Amino acid sequence: MRHRTALMGAVAAAALIPGMALAQERERGSSGHLNMIYWQAISTMNVFLSGGTKEMNAASIVLEPLARFDNMGELTPWLVDEVPTLDNGGVSEDLKSITWVLSEGLLWSDGTEVTADDVVFTWEYCTHPEGGCAYRDRFAGVESVEAVDDRTIVVSFEDATPNPYLPFVGAGSPIIQRAQFQDCTGTRAPECTDANFAPIGTGPYVVTDFRPNDVVQFEANPNYRVPTQPYFQTITWAGGGDAAGAARAVFQTGEMDYAWNLQLAPEVIEQMEAGGRGELLVDFGPLMERIEINFTDPSPSLPEGERATRQHPHPILSDIRVREALSLAIDRELLTEIGFGPMGQPTCNFIVAPPAMASPNNDACLVQDIDRANELLDEAGWEMGSDGIRTRDGERLELLFQTSTNAVRQDFQALIQQWWREIGIDTRLRNIDAGVFFGSDPGSPDTYLKFYADVQMYASLFEGTDPTPHLEQRRCGREPQPDTQWQGQNINRYCNEEYDALWSELNREPDPDRRVELVIALNDMFVQDFAHLPLVARGRVSAASTTVGGIVMNVWDSEHWNQAEWYRIEE
Amino acid sequence: MTDASMQPSGTPPPPAEDVHDLRPPRNQWWDVWDQFKTHKGALAGMIVFISILLFVTAGPWIWAVDPGLIDIRSRNQGSSWAHPMGTDQLGRDILARMMYGGRVSVAVGLVAMLLGLLLGTLIGVLAGYFKPMDGPLMRLTDLFLALPLLPLLLILVTLFRDTLEGMFGQATGVFLLIVFAIAITSWMQTARIVRGDVLALKEREFVLAARSIGTPSRRINTRHILPNVMSPIMVSATLGIATAIITESALSFLGLGFPPDFPTWGRILYDGRDWIEQYPARVVWPGVFISLTVLSVNYIGDGLRDALDPRIRGR
Amino acid sequence: MLNYTLRRLAFAVPTVLVISLIVFLMLDMAPGDPTASLPLTIPPEVREQMRLALGLGDPVLVRYVKWLHMMVVVEPSHMIANATGWNIGVEGPRILSWQTRSPVGDIIVQRMPQTLWVVGLGYLFGILIAVPIGVISAYRQYSWFDQAGTFVSMVGFSVPTFFTGVVFILIFSVWLGWFPSMYDTTHQVRDWDSFVFQVRQIAMPVAVLALFNASQISRFMRASMLDNLNQDYVRTARAKGLREKTVVLVHVLRNSMIPVVTVIAIGIPTVFTGAIITEQIFRVNGLGDALIRAIYVSDWPMVQTITFIFAILIVLFNLIADVLYGILDPRIRYD
């Protein structure tokens, strides 16, 4: 699996080189028309109002941030000439402010000039208390955003911030035009349909026709800053159908040039790929499928308000030996092979990417060890009963295992149920509609936040390349609880003073190398406590026609981050 | 009106050849059966349907393989002696899953149809015969016709799932929920058609005659009206059972029916859809079973329709 | 008759209102969270704010009255304004979809053409096929044509559309490459070539739907014809010396159409909500697709509005069916 990813990188690099060499011959619009399909269609072009990955991808070819991450996860200047750092003086010594300077001569697609004022407006727009901006947490801790002159922006933070690259960085934090959106702040945001569907941007394309949840048409931006780009004159960005239909359209019928998010059974994808018209693009980011272990007692006999809170530790799973046994009984290689094939990698880490931050210390869990698991349970005092289920003090070893309704997850549930049965655990399975499970309605008993089950499975990730906020989620007190309306991201109610102390150190540490060490230490502490069971690192999976060149898969930003450089390979 | 149609169909005139026979008059259901037998399609449908019923009820005793047993080494296999219909992506035996899935699908079809039919006929007759009830009942029908099945199902799931699961366990809970949801959203066609026929029937001479000799309403309905709307009800019933089975699989297709770990024919078909190129059998088997069941039921309905109609019978 | 129609129309208004209130309350009770489909990178606090921005703070009845005002006053005015170019759009907020944050009315107008093309034609062809098959099957009961017709219609009815659809795509689109596997909503018919393209892209879904609809309707047609062929008036007509063609095509057909017309009229509203599954398989972004996707992401204003339009159409077509009933069958007296 690993060599496959490396190979992908090589292909990407190779694709870049002819792209560069031929850049002189190619001109804006010379590649004609591009067809793309997202089987989950685009619902709006205003990322701030949606928050969905698909909307972010579509908007990324129109709206751009000041800097974004390239395919290696490196910060790359986009609307600026250089990324501000401590070394070049762009970031202040006390880590409390960052100064961005826009490139000269930047134009919006309507021909007007991009100014620092637009950047300030973007901040005002997204932080408006009634606007419901989906990327508001990008501006968490930001005290002010000021325009020093037409091209210079100073972002000031309330506290020392070792990672100041959240506001205006990456596809989730692009710049919008004040002139277009100034009457659309707060509660009026959704009323500006025309602006939300066809925002004026600095990117390589402009929207010519937008049909929500159906199709978007783009045309090359006449004022794009690179005069020879973009190579495709027009783009049709279709939506609808299902993943199999989208894959078929690229691989077999050739109706489409690019298809997004092809979560299909591995054998199915391989068969379609044999059609030869397209190739699969896979790269691995921080997305990881895991089993969360509940440290609190979800028993329905507890009163509402105390159920699944830290007042009642879990009677079975508080014992680390049981948690380790659960982990040892799972064959992660097999799960990956069945559920994701080349689109997944078995893992034992909480932080699976960027590669430098993935801990090398936990690979032991990749090997299934039923015997050891049985030993551990024996040690913990659970004795095998005559029906093959363990008991302790008359209590049966029973677990409730919940997840969202999804074919791959139900296959995983069935497999894991069988493995856990081999070590004497009776697992009851339950699946909940994704719209309810991932909802955050405090009134619903079935959300993943309430966690009224013993273990649950889902996938999660973090944005950008900095896992600090992701690691913060597991701090004591961050768990969903009645006092916080069940909001909070410490899903398994993990609580460890050592962990909290180490995280505080990470949050203050500016030195990159030391930060990596700390991230690995935190990761190891968390997973060696078997606080949750990582299963599979999942890749981003898209497919591209063999006739389109210049595509560089990117898991750290929008997949379309270099859309301007895509071109048609002439036969 | 001829004598034949003046007679309530419960007591058809004895066939001519029986006139001189001294045996007691035959039960009318024998006549129905005689007529039914002459319909080759219906007879074939009956045989197929009984075979399917045997397959799903007695099958698991003969083919005693656990449909949930995962055998990962033999996954994605074609048909063999060990697995006559092959195995799925987890190595589960598809034949065993078809048997268990069929139980659910057939049961959903039958129960939902009966429930829907009962409700539809009752409301149709009441609305058609009793004028004061016509308006309110038909508005109720309109109302139900306008309710979309899918959101209704979602709501029913949240409101009643915990209670039903607590009372009957997860499997039975979901089953009851889906049967109820299908029935509650499928009785309206029957009601409207029955009402339409009743409206026409009650203006007919034999009903007027019955009423003029003082027959009470209930009796007119059970003896004169109901037997005469039997044929549309039968057509509705066969359509209903088919619709129920197809609705169940359609719900699974949309991810709103039975959960993926609960095999039903619709669910197996849906799960096999992505694999149609590699293993067409995985779509074809459940597809064929659904189709055969519906087909046989339709033929049975067709035969019954002819057999139950005294005007056709004995022609 | 006119009196009856007017009375029914007067009844229709409260009916529709009650339906809309029930649907509104049901959706309000429904589980599902419009922010559930967002990536988990968006923290719960931000989700809470997004939900507040959707207007979920108000009590349910306030939201219902607001919605009703927008539905019956604001949206129609904008629809008329868009269709005619008159500047009569009523000021004020419109019904906004939670997912796209844009007026629901505009999306419905956008989705209408493809639904009418595909599902409408599927229905029309279905009727056109069904009526003659039903008539001939009944007239020549138990003939080889009847047996074959019955068998084909039974098969068409028995095989689920998502099975036929997937098989059709595999054969005609993947293996043979005759038809595109997805529907291009931006395509406009301008000349012969673009018309041919339109025919190609609707061919498969229309075929699947027509087969399915024809099977259903021909069953009713045949049953109804059989009922009538044995009636006394047919014997009388024949005894009178009328030509067989006149007897069957004028007398019997007219009477047999009564229940069939009911079935056809009741089915018409489904044309508008679209055959959800067929639209999904053939990637036609019609109204049915809009409805099911709105359900997936808990976009209740969208579901509510489409449902409401559906309700109006059903009430309307039921009324039409009843009026037709009276016209076709003079024995039925409504007054």
For every predicted segment, state its role.
Chain A
Residues 1-9:
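Bacterial N-terminal signal peptides that target proteins for export
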Residues 535:
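Active-site-proximal polar cores
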Residues 41-42, 105-106, 160-161, 242:
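Acidic glycine-/aspartate-rich tracts in secreted/extracellular proteins
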Residues 39-60, 79-80, 164-174, 202, ...:
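A structural "hinge/loop" feature
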Residues 29, 135-185, 209:
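Surface-exposed binding/hinge segments that line
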Residues 9-19:
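Bacterial N-terminal signal peptides
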Residues 22-27, 68-71, 83, 88-89, ...:
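Extracytoplasmic/periplasmic ligand-capture domains
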Residues 34-91, 124, 200-204:
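N-terminal lobe/hinge region of extracytoplasmic solute-binding protein
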